[in-house]
Amino acid sequence: MNFLRFLMFLSLGVWIGCLIFLPIVAQISFSMLPSPQLAGMVVRNSLLALHWIGLSGGGLFLLCSLIDNRITRGKFAWLRLSHILMIVMLALTAISQFSTIPRMDALRATAGEISTLPADSPIRRQFDALHSTSTHIEEAVLLLGIILLYLTSRRLTSARS
């Protein structure tokens, strides 16, 4: 049981840590690399890796939490707030990974270097809107993750009392 709880905290902590670190990678990439296109590719690939970390870690968290509930309470308790938050985090991450990013990639393939397009270009506006959506998704996942970390900490601390 302690090992399950350790895995819950580890998986959630790694995911939250990656979400916090990604903007740092982005800032350094855009300030140090010779072109915005190259920096964008570094950030894109980092984000894809982050999503796989999140999807696998989130799945592990959910599985361990359900098993922990079964052991300690005799039921899986699917509708716990912590499970709902994790499912929302996983859904948002999947939307970004399998919908938003591929659409951004398609625009890049069509237009080439997005940063060279005029600001009023329809492709540029569409890309910027998708980029904004992607940013908001990551912010939402981070906020939900922090809330979930707090709730999980509180739940597991009160379970010991």
Question: Which role does the model predict for each range below?
Answer:
Residues 2-80, 106-128, 160:
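Interfacial loop at the N-terminal end of multi-pass membrane proteins
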Residues 21-25, 95, 99-102, 147:
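Transmembrane alpha-helix boundary/anchor motif
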Residues 60-71, 138-159:
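Transmembrane alpha-helical segments in integral membrane proteins
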Residues 93, 97, 135-142:
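Alpha-helical transmembrane segments of helical membrane proteins, especially in multi-pass transport
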Residues 52, 56-59, 88, 133-136:
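Hydrophobic residues within alpha-helical transmembrane segments
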Residues 9, 83-87, 137-142:
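Hydrophobic H-region at the start of alpha-helical membrane spans
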Residues 15-16, 85-101:
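Hydrophobic alpha-helical membrane-insertion segments
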Residues 79-91, 125, 129-133:
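Alpha-helical membrane-spanning segments of integral membrane proteins, especially the hydrophobic core
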